[in-house]
């Protein structure tokens, strides 16, 4: 078994440590309507197409009940569309500030390319959003061989279509010769649904939800407890492997190739 390509997520995996760009915006669009949502709630659907993320938030029982208490009805599709339009407007303005490659990513990508590994990517951002992020990331030294957004396929995560399109464009098959790596539950489901080796990265992830400063300053026992919670969540949602940092990816690849493991 030889791994021929790795498909990376973007925010929380290769750029934007902690996946903070969309978080505050999701909270803001609800707050403006008198409905407070927590950071934990805002993060839960992370990785989905962003309008689906807004919709998922409105369907959470506590948020739906609070909305109903204030407005006398549940959120409508018009409400969702209006909030999404506001989300886009605010996010576009701040995205360039959240496109810096996470520490160590560029070095890992360079090492993979030296081994002849192709680099693909998928995202929950729209094509218009990624035009901003990808351009800024490229200026800072990170540019995958191919990028697929939910706009390019019939549906985003957890459907496997973005991974399939990467495979076609990169010319790699079968799918178990590829690794999908991401930082959310929806990434794990996307990879498994595509029949790929699926890896969850923990530090810098949306699931962990901590900044670099918070990680550095946190009590080691508390940090370890949080890491294990995320690790278990990834495994429960289909991850074949979990890594704490991107630097561990190549050792995972070697395990797959040397031990002839079988996807289950």
Curated annotation (Swiss-Prot):
Primary enzyme class: hydrolase
GO biological process: DNA repair; organic phosphonate catabolic process
Subunit structure: Homodimer.
Protein name: Phosphonoacetaldehyde hydrolase
Gene3D superfamilies documented for this protein: HAD superfamily/HAD-like, Putative phosphatase, domain 2
Cofactors demanded by this protein: Mg(2+)
Binding site for Mg(2+): 9, 11, 183
Organism listed in the record: Bacillus thuringiensis (strain Al Hakam)
Keyword Metal-binding among record annotations: yes
GO molecular function: magnesium ion binding; phosphoglycolate phosphatase activity; phosphonoacetaldehyde hydrolase activity
InterPro entries given in the database record: HAD-like_hydrolase_sf, HAD-like_sf, HAD-SF_hydro_IA, HAD_sf, PGP-like_dom2, Phosphonoacetald_hydro
Family, similarity comment: Belongs to the HAD-like hydrolase superfamily. PhnX family.
């Amino acid at each position: 078994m030889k791994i021929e390509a790795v498909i990376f997520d973007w925010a929380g995996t290769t750029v934007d440590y902690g996946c903070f760009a969309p978080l505050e915006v999701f909270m803001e669009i609800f707050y403006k309507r008198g409905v407070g949502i927590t950071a934990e709630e805002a993060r839960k659907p992370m990785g989905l197409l962003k309008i689906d993320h807004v919709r998922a938030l409105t369907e959470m029982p506590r948020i739906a009940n609070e909305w109903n208490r204030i407005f006398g009805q549940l959120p409508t599709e018009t409400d969702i569309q209006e909030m999404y339009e506001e989300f886009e407007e605010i996010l576009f303005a701040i995205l360039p500030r959240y496109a810096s490659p996470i520490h160590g990513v560029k070095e890992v990508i360079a090492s993979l390319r030296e081994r002849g590994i192709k680099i693909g990517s998928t995202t929950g951002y729209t094509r218009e959003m990624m035009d901003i992020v990808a351009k800024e990331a490229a200026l800072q030294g990170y540019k995958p061989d191919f990028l697929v957004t939910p706009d390019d396929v019939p549906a985003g995560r957890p459907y496997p279509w973005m991974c399939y399109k990467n495979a076609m464009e990169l010319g790699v098959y079968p799918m178990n010769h590829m690794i999908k790596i991401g930082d959310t539950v929806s990434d794990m489901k996307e990879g498994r649904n595509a029949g790929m080796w699926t890896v969850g990265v923990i530090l810098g992830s949306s699931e962990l939800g901590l900044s670099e400063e918070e990680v550095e300053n946190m009590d080691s026992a508390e940090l370890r407890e949080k890491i294990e919670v995320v690790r278990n969540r990834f495994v429960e949602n289909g991850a074949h492997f979990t890594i704490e940092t991107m630097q561990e990816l190549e050792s995972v690849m070697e395990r797959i190739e040397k031990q002839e493991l079988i996807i289950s």
